[in-house]
Amino acid sequence: MNILNRLQAWGNWFTNDPVGFLIFMVYYAAAILITLMLHEIAHGYVAYRCGDPTAKMLGRLTFDPRKHLDPLGTVSLVLLGFGWAKPVPVNPRNFRGNYLRANLLVSVAGVATNLTLFIISLFIATLLNPLLWQPEVIQYYGAKELLSSNGVAFGAIVYGMVNDSLLATPWLLHVQRFLLLFAAMNLTIAVFNLLPIPPLDGFHVLNDLVLKGRLTMNAQFYRFAQIALLLLMFSGVLISILQVITGAVESGVLNVFLLLTGTA
């Protein structure tokens, strides 16, 4: 869904069902805040453990969203489904021991946190799935279709438009609604940040792990890379790439979870 279509759909929804829309935005905002804050806190905490107190001294190891949210990155996340927070300030000169190892750990900390949250929330959602739906619903659609972000029920679940007659335990829908939205958002943010484009984490991982820190950028190149990233985002090209990658990862993880829980 492109930006104009999403805005139009949300505008129509707000006009026709303002209460339902505002309830959804509470879920959506909570998922955004938690996802972005934990991503950046992870960077700062690992940097602190590696010897750099910069993030701690500047108050970035906090759950106060005002310290973390980047206006453009947050708007992008709302409109496009992926975005970023304010980068945590890191001073590599404070690192103890191996500089490249410490820098690599700091770079992957945010992505590792998002992937962990994705796995935990999707696993809990898999466990709750047979408790949420009437048995005939699961039999008709299949468990995976009711859990996948590409499945038939995802939109109905996260937008709160499921008929209670289909549910075995209606109150669980509120929990499942957040878990599936939270899982999808964390996976998208993780994959997005792994792209090897400055200023994303993937660039630092590539530079530290593969290039051994040999690639340096001046301010002009850094700004050019940021502009190129924004153009890719708003052109829709990046959305298509992310959807393919996240869809494949989610499908594989879901297959494993359904086998482990015996609910396939």
What residue ranges belong to the model's regions?
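Hydrophobic transmembrane alpha-helices and their immediate loop junctions
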Residues: 1-264
